[in-house]
């Protein structure tokens, strides 16, 4: 089972692209535990959540683990605190020898996506970024972690 962290811009509106990436990961691994930030404004988190729930309903080995931020208690600092918590969950699985990865769907220079992706990279979690360039997404596997990603 792949333990996957999805982070992304709330303005990422290409659901089909995210569904394509997640479906390919599912086909490669046979099961996914999908963690995401549960952004209430939609975007990449919502597309990932929709994909996970749609596949789970059809009997696929997919579980969805949303990590909503506590904006009422933490105010503007809620996003980075939530990102740290999500990364720590995945990092813990990495240290237990579980296959893990982070896919970051980045658009409009999203600070939250940058924050979460950077924290994942520092934690040693294999990171793939998908950057929306206006017409299409460009996928980048971070070279220093390519061997880790291929092993996941």
What residue ranges belong to the model's regions?
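Acidic/glycine-enriched connector segments
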Residues: 2-3, 11-150
């Amino acid at each position: 089972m792949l333990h996957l962290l999805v982070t992304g811009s709330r303005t990422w509106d290409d659901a089909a692209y995210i569904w394509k990436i997640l479906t390919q990961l599912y086909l490669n691994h046979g099961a996914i535990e999908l963690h995401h930030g549960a952004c209430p404004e939609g975007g990449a988190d919502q597309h990932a959540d929709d994909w996970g729930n749609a596949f789970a309903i059809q009997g696929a080995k997919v579980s969805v683990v949303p990590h909503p931020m506590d904006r009422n208690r933490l105010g503007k600092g809620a996003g980075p605190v939530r990102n740290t918590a999500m990364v720590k969950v995945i990092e813990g699985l990495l240290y237990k020898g579980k296959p893990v990865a982070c896919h970051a769907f980045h658009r409009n220079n999203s600070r939250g996506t940058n924050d979460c992706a950077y924290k994942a990279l520092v934690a040693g979690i294999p990171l793939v970024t998908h950057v929306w360039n206006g017409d299409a997404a460009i996928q980048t596997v971070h070279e220093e972690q390519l061997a880790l990603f291929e092993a996941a």
